[in-house]
Amino acid sequence: MVDGLSQPQGLRYQYELDSLARFSAEARSKTPFRCFRTNNFMIDRDLMLAHPLRSDIKTYGYEDVLFGKTLEDAGASILHIDNPVGYHTLESNQLYINKVEESLHTLFAYREELEGYSPLLDGVEMLRRKHLLGVARQLYSPLATLIRRNLTGKNPSLLLLKVFKVGTYLQIMK
């Protein structure tokens, strides 16, 4: 069990465990606004009132990243600390994949505002510059069902989760 996580076979568990190292306070401090998350933060009341969370975002995902961008634009400062969030239960792999998919639609809808704030958008831009978007779509398309089956199954792969995110985003872009 890690920080209250108790489902070692679950995809969300694996993702959160993998994220602990990648998103330490030290790592997040290197790009403080790109790494902002709303699941565990404190903010000055006046700053929050002056820059509330966006009410136009109705779908899951990226609201916290956009809020971090708003704080950066406002000249606010962020101090990242290691203060892990505990999870007693996590959603099923299927529910997590549904949330990931919804967040990719949100990312697409706000892609212009999120430029420079999303590693996924950075990767897609690199594929575009190298004229590989079509090739990547063609490679992903026949594998999409198998990848989804892995991600919703008993032994999901974090590598395939990354492939799923890129491939699904490319399909949304069509």
Predicted feature residues:
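Conserved donor NDP-sugar-binding/catalytic core segment of glycosyltransferases
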Residues: 1-13
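Short, hinge-like loop/turn segments at secondary-structure boundaries
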Residues: 10-17, 96-99
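A recurrent flexible, glycine/aromatic-enriched loop bordering the glycosyltransferase active site
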Residues: 23-43
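Substrate-positioning beta->alpha
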Residues: 44-47, 63
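A generic structural signal for short hydrophobic patches within well-formed alpha-helices
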Residues: 47-49, 86
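Acidic donor-binding loop at a coil-to-helix junction in glycosyltransferase catalytic cores
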Residues: 59-67
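Active-site donor/metal-binding and catalytic loop motifs
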Residues: 74-112
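Non-catalytic, C-terminal membrane-associated alpha-helical segments of glycosyltransferases
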Residues: 102, 121-174
